[in-house]
Amino acid sequence: MKFVLLFGVLLVTLFSYSSAEMFDDFDQADEDELLSLIEKEEARAKECTPRFYDCSHDRHSCCRSELFKDVCTCFYPEGGDNEVCTCQQPKHLKYMEKAAGKAKKFGGKIKKWFG
């Protein structure tokens, strides 16, 4: 009976040690993958198209504003047959950003009064 108990404890110890190493390997792989994704995102972020610039070459390349990403909007100018695409911020998102900015200011004042 003592032998079975000792053997069981040994098995549990070995199993926990091997699973801990396995989890460490997974954590390292996840960390490496996350770092590579962050590097790709930073490289892609440098190539964004500013607001009111031509985005016809890549319609998903518009830069972000404070809260939202600008949208590539295409239109035909008066008297022209060529389509023109520029990065623009939709009005409803512009108003939402203004409201969020005012709410942030108001929250700071309340914190100052009661904090």
Swiss-Prot record:
Q: Which InterPro entries match?
A: Spider_toxin_CSTX_knottin, Spider_toxin_CSTX_Knottin_CS
Please give the residues making up the propeptide in this record: 21-44
- Localization in the cell: Secreted
Q: Which GO terms describe its cellular component?
A: extracellular region
Query: Where is the secretion signal located?
Result: 1-20
Main location group: secreted
Q: Which UniProt keywords apply?
A: Disulfide bond, Knottin, Secreted, Signal, Toxin
Question: How would you summarize where this protein is expressed among tissues?
Answer: Expressed by the venom gland.
The molecular function terms of the Gene Ontology recorded here are: toxin activity
The cysteines covalently paired via disulfide bonds are 48-63, 55-72, 62-87, 74-85
**Keyword Disulfide bond attributed:** yes
* Pfam hit, one: Toxin_35
Q: Which family does it belong to?
A: Belongs to the neurotoxin 19 (CSTX) family. 01 subfamily.
Q: What does the entry's free-text domain comment contain?
A: The presence of a 'disulfide through disulfide knot' structurally defines this protein as a knottin.
Q: What is this protein's name? A: U3-lycotoxin-Ls1k
**Taxonomy-wise, where does this protein's organism fall, top ranks first?**
Eukaryota, Metazoa, Ecdysozoa, Arthropoda, Chelicerata
